[in-house]
């Protein structure tokens, strides 16, 4: 569905992406992880058609998103930004309903609001919500948009969509993204919580600081201390919980603390 091939991009002569190659498939949630400045958000902007690579291609169902009209993009791609940018004078239900005009009061919107624990806040002004609640409302809007898309090409891009959420709501949000993927969408999500990425994403792409894909594949196989330590420059301790899930904890060496 989403295929990136040999993506190169630089700003003011400084390379940001160097030959990034990966894919995000229908029915799967793909985590995009890496240190700050590795080019994760830049890749999402290319996928949105906002930026064009200097070299290489990124296509969605064979189409270059930069060459699509705004209505065509909206019918294929939903986006969750790092920070909410909607007008604060609207209610939660109105914000979510923007994704499907005329369906603001539909059962679809109500269902998504309930899944993200926003059903009791749907009448509140978006601007009165906490940062985590605003993230949930913004995510709800994108999911409603995906469900309303008319064609078979459905892609959801999310840039750190759970960074302000508490653990319970972050897990609920990731589970809903997984359900959205299972309904025929390709989901590509930037995450800094590596344990969440390993446990709740199907696949993972690891970007190094130099904008090179260091590893890509099933999340459980890719997100390991051996792969992550040289990328992030810290040691990771892996522990297995009673349920069998692996938890990754970064450990900063005492010799590096000033």
Annotate each language-model stretch with its function.
Residues 48:
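Helix-to-loop junction immediately C-terminal to a conserved catalytic motif
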Residues 64-78:
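ABC ATPase NBD coupling module
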Residues 33-35:
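The feature captures the beta-strand-to-loop junction immediately N-terminal to the Walker
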Residues 56-64:
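Conserved ABC transporter NBD signature motif
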Residues 225, 229-258:
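ABC ATPase nucleotide-binding domains
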């Amino acid at each position: 569905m989403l295929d990136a091939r040999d993506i190169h991009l630089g700003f003011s002569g400084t390379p940001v992406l160097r030959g990034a190659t990966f894919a995000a498939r229908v029915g799967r949630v793909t985590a995009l992880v890496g240190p700050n400045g590795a080019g994760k958000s830049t890749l999402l902007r290319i996928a949105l058609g906002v930026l064009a690579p200097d070299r290489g291609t990124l296509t969605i169902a064979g189409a270059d998103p930069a060459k699509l009209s705004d209505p065509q993009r909206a019918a294929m791609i939903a986006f969750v930004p790092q920070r909410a940018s909607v007008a604060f004078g609207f209610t939660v239900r109105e914000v979510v309903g923007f994704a499907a005009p005329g369906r603001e009061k539909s059962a679809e919107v109500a269902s998504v609001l309930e899944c993200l624990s926003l059903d009791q806040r749907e009448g509140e002004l978006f601007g009165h919500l906490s940062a985590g609640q605003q993230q949930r409302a913004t995510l709800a809007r994108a999911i409603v948009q995906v469900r309303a898309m008319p064609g078979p090409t459905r892609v959801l891009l999310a840039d750190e969509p759970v960074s302000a959420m508490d653990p319970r709501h972050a897990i609920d949000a990731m589970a809903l993204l997984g359900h959205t993927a299972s309904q025929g969408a390709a989901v590509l999500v930037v995450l800094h919580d590596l344990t969440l990425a390993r446990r709740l994403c199907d696949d993972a792409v690891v970007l190094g600081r130099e904008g090179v894909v260091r590893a890509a594949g099933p999340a459980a196989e890719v997100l390991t201390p051996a792969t992550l330590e040289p990328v992030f420059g810290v040691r990771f301790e892996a522990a297995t919980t009673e349920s069998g899930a692996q938890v990754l904890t970064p450990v900063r060496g005492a010799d590096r603390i000033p």
